[in-house]
Amino acid sequence: MHLRITQHLRIMYRSIEDFLSTRKEEESSTVKLFSNLTEETKSVKIHENVRSLERLAWHITQTLTEMGKNAGLFETDLLHELPIPATLPELIETYVNYNTLLMRTVRLKWTDSNLDDLVNMYGEEWKKGKILSVLIAHESHHRSQMTVIMRMLGLPVPGIYGPSKEEWASFGMPPMD
């Protein structure tokens, strides 16, 4: 799965600070989205081939340590095979804690000058700067999936990169089609 997604990703970070700034913004967007989930709908599967909202949220969270371990940032995959946290607040807290750990570890272990270094990832050689880009793109990809499921379940969807349908009214404008 990761290989198909990343084969087309040609962009990469050349600055740790640029990545950390983007990563913090993405964390805010992810927490905003996770905060709109409900305990009543988190485990609903809208189709047998579609993950539940909580499973997608947990996948986003687990990827922080899974990719971090594969990239050499962590000794072990700290969240591997752990169950989904029982409540949404616990899931959000876990996401924030491990995102913070990832950012701190990137800052400590990697430098701008080694972002061109190659790391074996999923049977391919990736530059460290590409790994950072994939972390961002992967999370955005799965958040997008979550917004569709949220709409289908009747949950409000927050704007991430622009206003959502629900937010257009606050601008005094009708929602765009």
Task: Please state what every model-predicted region is.
Residues T105, S113, E166-A169:
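A general structural signal for short secondary-structure boundary/capping elements
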Residues M1-I11:
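N-terminal amphipathic/basic-hydrophobic helices that include classical n-h-c signal peptides
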Residues F34-N36:
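His/Met- and acidic-residue-enriched segments that coordinate or traffic transition-metal cofactors
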Residues L9, L20-K24, S28-V31, T41-E81, ...:
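Short, contiguous alpha-helical
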Residues Y13, Y95-Y98, Y122, Y161:
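Sequence-level detector for tyrosine residue identity
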Residues K69, L73-W110:
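Helix-adjacent hinge/juxtasegments
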